[in-house]
């Protein structure tokens, strides 16, 4: 048999129903990501080998069959939270569908333990193992653990995008409120900077302060701008540099805390066909400084922080209605723009709504043009924001181009009057427009899961808006542990309505071992195997890593089939050494001696490998011999 997988190799897994990943680091295949971008919601999604919601691995490559499998979790209307009663069932569909009735009972395997227990189940007849362990949310269900976070660039030598690292203490740049910093309740400024604000989700161990170097965080942990009365009696809004405002901070519902986080990819791209229609939010907290270009009758209607920018909506080239060449929709006249990229929930297979911010007072840092184009400046000129920093300079935070990612909350809240999957920003616009009520605004931000800070790396420049802004596509991956649960990509009421369900909307997966199955040693296979035969090291310069002593000379002829004959000749055609191999080892050691056990001379040798009934392979090898070491005599 010829193996097509290694021990520990994973398999591509397709999710049909349900959601959850345990502690798995999910990664979609290219085809699944394109399906989501084309259709907003994918009915099925496929994950790359080793990055699926279930850990399925090869443990015996020779035994892996060419088969199609189905994996069901709790194949009835069971409560997956009560994991002690939930089991999984793996079915070899290929074996089940053959004509041998004796295979029917062999084709189905039920887990020997419930998913409440961490167990790697060995399926030795199929050369596989399955690990499926239900995740239990800590802190009475209010917390989940981060699994992985990364940022990658198509051109890794040009990391143009960075963020604003979180700082500690009473500083405007302490924008992630994790830890145990507790301010005095009677000092307003300390209340604003309090990590332990009443009602907020707790992250006392600060595990979420380190996401990508403290540049991304859960929305429920970010800092907020609030009114503070100074000793002079003046009331000011502090801190100015913050992603949200008092009243919209923290966990706004049972679904918006840390345990409600989702697994997302945020992609920045110059491909305008993939850009996201979204609101542009005003980030200037001083009402009188915010830009007002809404073309009204002259009354002062300057926007409050975290509301729609008072600026005409722009198209993908930054033009607005009335300007030559404008190509934008006409039904969202104010405050809408385009984020140069997209966000995907890799756990549910949905494209997500987004928003980004701008501080319209910071025009020099691109804060007033309705484009996501952060500057490289954390600090500005001489002045100084609350908390100081930067040698007394004011904090500009790149123009405050915060990135907001919103999950589809319709399913978990059980109503269609909640944030949907990507709808070109329609839900966000309807609920955030100037006349939007406080209830509507809270409804929006209770669906916000992740916030990213934005800063252009020193020494880099963005492209022009006409060329797509992004100089080098970047991908941010944010992964957390999620419990397995019911889910339907098309049915909001999946808890009670099973129409169209195969497994009661509980997790249901399929995978194939066709590409990794062991195959018989057919002639065509072995012929290709001949191409892999090699000799190492080549050339040999007096030493090799395979030698065990000063008197040892050794090279290896590698990637050999089980049965073959190896003949080694000098350039005069004289046979120097012959090996007859008939064992499962894949290499033969040559001690650089002839048949009479005499060390060979340096030079070029011809190595001929003959595989009976298949073919042969000829290699040239060059070696330089070292003098015999007589120190040991």
PLM regions with names:
Residues 602-603, 607:
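Hydrophobic beta-strand segments within extracellular beta-sandwich modules
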Residues 2-570, 576-596, 608-610, 616, ...:
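Polybasic, low-complexity Lys/Arg-rich tracts in intrinsically disordered regions
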């Amino acid at each position: 048999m010829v193996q097509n997988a290694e021990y520990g190799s994973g398999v591509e897994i397709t999710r049909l129903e349900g959601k959850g990943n345990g502690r798995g680091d999910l990664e979609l295949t290219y085809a699944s990501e394109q399906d989501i971008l084309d259709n907003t919601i994918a009915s099925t999604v496929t994950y790359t080998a080793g990055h699926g919601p279930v850990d399925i691995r090869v443990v015996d490559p020779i035994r892996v069959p060419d088969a199609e499998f189905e994996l069901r979790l709790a194949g009835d209307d069971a409560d997956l939270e009560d994991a002690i009663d939930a089991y999984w069932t793996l079915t070899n569909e290929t074996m089940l569908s053959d004509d041998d009735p004796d295979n029917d009972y062999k084709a189905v395997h039920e887990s020997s333990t419930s998913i409440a227990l961490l167990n790697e189940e060995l399926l030795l007849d199929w050369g596989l193992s399955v690990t499926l362990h239900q995740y239990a949310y800590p802190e009475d269900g209010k917390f989940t653990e981060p699994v992985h976070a990364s940022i990658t660039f198509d051109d890794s030598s040009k990391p143009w995008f960075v963020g604003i690292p979180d700082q500690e203490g009473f500083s405007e740049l302490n924008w992630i409120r994790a830890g145990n910093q507790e301010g005095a309740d009677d000092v307003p400024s300390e209340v604003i900077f309090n990590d332990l604000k009443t009602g907020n989700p707790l992250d006392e161990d600060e595990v979420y302060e380190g996401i990508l170097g403290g540049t991304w965080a859960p929305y429920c942990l970010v800092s907020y701008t609030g009114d503070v009365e100074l000793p002079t009696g003046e009331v000011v809004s502090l801190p100015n540099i913050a992603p949200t405002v008092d009243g919209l901070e923290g966990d706004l519902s049972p679904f918006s805390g840390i345990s409600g986080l989702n697994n997302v990819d945020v992609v920045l791209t110059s491909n305008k066909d993939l850009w996201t229609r979204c609101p542009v939010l005003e980030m200037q907290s001083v009402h009188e400084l915010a830009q007002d270009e809404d073309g009204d009758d002259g009354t002062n209607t300057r926007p409050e922080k975290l509301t729609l920018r008072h600026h005409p909506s722009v198209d993908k080239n930054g033009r607005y209605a009335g300007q030559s060449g404008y190509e934008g929709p006409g039904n969202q006249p104010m405050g809408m723009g385009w984020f140069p990229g997209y966000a995907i929930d890799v756990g549910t297979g949905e494209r997500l709504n987004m928003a980004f911010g701008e501080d319209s007072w910071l025009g020099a840092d691109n804060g007033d043009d309705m484009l996501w184009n952060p500057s490289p400046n954390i600090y500005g000129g001489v002045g100084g924001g609350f908390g100081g920093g930067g040698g007394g300079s004011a904090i500009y935070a790149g123009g405050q181009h915060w990135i907001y990612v919103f999950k589809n909350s319709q399913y978990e809240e059980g109503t269609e009057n909640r944030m949907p999957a990507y709808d070109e920003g329609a839900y966000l616009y309807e609920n955030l427009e100037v006349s939007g009520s406080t209830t509507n605004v809270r409804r929006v931000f209770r669906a916000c899961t992740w916030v990213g800070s934005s800063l252009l790396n020193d020494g880099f420049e963005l492209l022009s808006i006409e060329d797509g802004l992004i100089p080098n596509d970047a991908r941010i991956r944010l992964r957390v542990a999620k419990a397995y649960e019911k889910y339907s990509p098309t049915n909001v009421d999946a808890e009670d309505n099973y129409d169209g369900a195969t497994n009661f909307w509980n997790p249901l997966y399929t995978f194939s071992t066709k590409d990794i199955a062991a195959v018989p040693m057919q002639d065509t296979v072995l012929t290709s195997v001949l191409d892999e035969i090699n000799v190492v090291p080549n050339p040999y310069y007096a030493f090799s890593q395979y030698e065990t002593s000063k008197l040892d000379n050794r090279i290896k002829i590698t990637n050999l089939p089980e049965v073959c004959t190896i003949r080694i000749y000098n350039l005069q055609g004289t046979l120097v050494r012959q090996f007859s191999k008939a064992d499962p080892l894949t290499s033969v050691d040559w001690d650089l001696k002839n048949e009479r056990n005499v060390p060979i001379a340096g030079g070029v040798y011809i190595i001929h490998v003959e595989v009976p009934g298949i073919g042969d392979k000829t290699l040239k090898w060059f070696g330089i011999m070292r003098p015999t070491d007589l120190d040991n005599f």
